[in-house]
């Protein structure tokens, strides 16, 4: 497997609830006064799904009301459709749910994914750049909709070395860090700055992760 070959996410389920029970809406973070319908997805990669959910908010009148990674990742899933994450979008209009789900699927199939950081793909890296944030990840990062952001993820030591390299390689600031362990035992960070700067930071992050994989005990 070539280094930095795409590891495409697998979409495991896409379902709609056009008229959800108010109790269910409330339980999953929706507001029955504003939301009537839900769209649900499960995927075997969590971070690309967070990106896809955010993308949906830019193209459809939907809110991301629930999105959680599952403990220990997709290799330890509770069932064949569980994957690594459940994401839920909500709207008052079933057609908006449909539009949002279409964006989510398209983003997962053609945009956001992990990459192999070594020859056998046992180390994965997510050096993703969002040119314009939607309403979901902007809140999570403490940024404004429309701002660029680098969304960086890797295993613990690789991510730590990579984040240091990214911060030194470009004029970016650390908007939020997720030290290990996360639910999936990775580590992550959001970096803010001008688009070309976050792109440079993401590239430096990926390169550093690859180098750590090649030389894990370098002095």
Where are these regions (language model features)?
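Short active-site-adjacent helix-start/loop capping segments
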Residues: 49-51, 73-76, 96-97
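N-terminal low-complexity, intrinsically disordered segments
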Residues: 49-59
């Amino acid at each position: 497997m070539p280094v930095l070959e795409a590891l495409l996410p697998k979409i495991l389920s896409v379902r709609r609830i056009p008229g959800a029970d108010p109790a269910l809406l409330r339980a999953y973070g929706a507001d029955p006064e504003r939301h009537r319908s839900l769209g649900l997805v499960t995927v075997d990669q969590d971070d690309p799904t967070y990106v896809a959910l955010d993308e949906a908010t830019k193209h459809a009148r939907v809110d991301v009301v629930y999105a959680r990674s599952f403990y220990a990742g997709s290799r330890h899933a509770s069932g064949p459709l569980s994957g690594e994450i459940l994401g839920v979008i909500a709207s008052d209009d079933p057609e908006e749910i449909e539009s949002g789900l279409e964006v989510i699927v398209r983003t997962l199939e053609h945009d956001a994914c992990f990459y192999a950081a070594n020859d056998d793909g046992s180390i994965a890296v997510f050096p993703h750049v969002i040119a314009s944030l939607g309403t979901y990840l902007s809140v999570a990062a403490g940024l404004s909709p429309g701002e660029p952001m680098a969304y960086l993820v890797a295993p613990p030591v690789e991510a730590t070395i990579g984040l240091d390299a990214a911060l030194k390689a470009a004029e970016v600031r650390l908007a939020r860090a997720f030290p290990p362990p996360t639910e999936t035992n990775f580590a992550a960070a959001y970096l803010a700055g001008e688009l070309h700067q976050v792109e440079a930071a993401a590239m430096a992050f990926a390169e550093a992760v690859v180098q750590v994989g090649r030389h894990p005990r370098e002095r």
